[in-house]
A protein has these predicted regions:
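Sec-dependent N-terminal signal peptides
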Residues: 4-13
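Cell-envelope and extracellular/periplasmic
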Residues: 20-229
Length: 229
């Protein structure tokens, strides 16, 4: 009887470990040019596979250069109440990829990595950016049926400050930091030292995208450790 009892305890213990480790970590990478140019297969996937196991991660990248947040947030309007004819096209394609790659899969954590904002800054739509980003997160929570999504925001670099071409540039940086700071599951990543020499808006400086990848991975691991125990 004692032997049976011990075997039962061992069995339950093993089940608990399995249950705790069950599921895969889903990483969603989205945004405009600096996310589109980011070589995730080289600078992101190997690191998260090493951290969690190649069979324990799903990575989906959906990005396109020069796109405003309205291509993701479906209810986007300008401060004047103007609305584009079409919204949410890139969001729809992202969700389609998620559904395809996660069908029948138990998801342990979701981390949304966002690198976007240049287009909205240049267009003068900084004043509605926070509202739009929060709306985008609500879309994700609803469509993924999760309230525990981790968020990483790649803050705009200091490119616009150096060029002095857009007085709204610093305002957007502050908005992005506030969005991260107000959410316990979010953080922002500094990119000021990653500017390229020729096209300084993009991170083509030697090792720029590699360093960006390292920061994404470090931030993601920290958020997952803190929030998805």
């Amino acid at each position: 009887m004692k032997t049976l009892f011990l075997l039962t305890l061992i069995s339950l213990s093993c089940f608990s470990v399995t249950a705790a480790d069950a599921g895969k970590h889903l990483f969603l990478l989205s945004g405009q040019s600096n996310m589109s140019r980011f070589q995730h297969k080289q600078f992101f996937i190997p690191a998260v596979q090493a951290a969690y196991g190649a069979d324990k991660v799903i990575i989906i990248k959906n990005a396109q250069g020069g796109q405003p947040i309205s291509k993701w947030y479906k209810a986007w309007t300008s401060s004047k109440g103007e609305k584009p004819q079409e919204t949410g096209q890139l969001y729809d394609s992202l969700i389609e990829s998620v559904k395809e790659k996660t069908a029948g899969v138990q998801i342990k954590s979701i981390t949304f990595i966002w690198m976007q904002g240049e287009s909205d800054t240049k267009a003068g739509n900084v004043d509605v950016y926070a509202k739009s980003f929060r709306g985008l997160l609500r879309q994700l929570e609803k469509d993924l049926n999760r309230k525990d999504i981790n968020i990483i925001i790649g803050r705009l670099s200091d490119f616009g400050l150096k060029k002095r071409s857009n007085p709204k540039w610093e305002e957007m940086r502050k908005v992005q930091m506030k969005l991260a700071d107000e959410n316990p599951r979010a953080c922002w990543v500094d990119t000021d030292d990653l500017n390229g020499e020729k096209h300084s808006l993009h991170y083509v400086r030697p090792e720029g995208y590699r360093k960006l990848g390292e920061r994404y991975v470090e931030a993601a691991r920290k958020l997952i450790k803190e929030n998805n125990k």
